[in-house]
Amino acid sequence: MLSFTYERRFESHPDYAELWGIRKAIREIQSNLRKKSHGEKETARNRLSRLRFRATELEVKIDTELFDEARVVACTLVGSANRVLTNRNFTTLFIDEAAQALEAACWIAIGKADRVILAGDHHQLPPTIKCIEAARGGLDHTLMQKITDRKPETVSLLKTQYRMNEDIMRFPSRWFYHDELQSAPEVKHRGILEFDTPVVWLDTADCHFEEDRLDDSMSRINRDEATLLVSTLQKYIEKIGKERVLDESIDFGLISPYKSQVQYIRGLIKRDTFFKPFRRLITAHTVDGFQGQERDVIMISLVRANDKGRIGFLGDLRRMNVAITRARMKLMILGDAPTLTRHAFYKELYEYIWENGQVITCLLYTS
């Protein structure tokens, strides 16, 4: 791919050697300018002016030829405003990951195209807006979302998915995609262990784990739940077989919506010598860190456990959709059911797993 980048194509152009020589000459003249007399400086400046004019002339010539020949140009939305694309028009503009693109950024590129195709999933992560006031003002409402809401007839859903076991897929399909997703035959029944249950909820309620709020941040942590997750991971690796995990490079994703929980889990993994051979196969990250990725096994620590049913930004269901759909063959959710199931989404998810997977009390893993 590097050979097709703008920089590499530019450097491969027949006129680049002359341009490089001119740039070198400019640098040499500039470095020696202070040492020259007044008259010599004037001569040098005149030469610099001519060299710079010729360098600009060559740059424009190379750019024009490169982009005249190009059938496809790939760039960021903001990058489409680069001077090399000035006054250029394109038949079709594809905006990938459009659900994460700010509308204002989209319009930078849209003005250069006759038609636009937005590709993405507005049921997954939105753009990152650091200013709360801007988000409340609508900056986090993307162009893709607006089109989906106002012109649903223009939307096409890619219905066949090639990642997940069907039991993992069915719930997000039902909740987010009008039950329209289908599994490709080669992944429909994929699994690691024979007779294994693809979807499991490990209910922490009976263990009375407690969430904590860190003093220096808004983040939450549930240390006992993190310890249970790591213990459960070890048991599952042992169940599969250590050699098989290494031979087949079976990989594991440990996800939590809370950064503090992720950091605590990473520390537990790092300090436990059992995981040393498997560390390259284990990734612990927030939901945002897993966007666009997938793992054979996904374990999710939901953290929240309180008497009032407060779940904070677990209520952003787009993040949960991302977390759930990262798994290829095994999905394990660790969470306090009485706290979480006060929310309609988690109630239905819990009931789905009860009926189609397996709900296990934490007592079986801590005894």
What are these regions (language model features)?
Residues 2-91:
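Conserved helicase NTPase catalytic core signature
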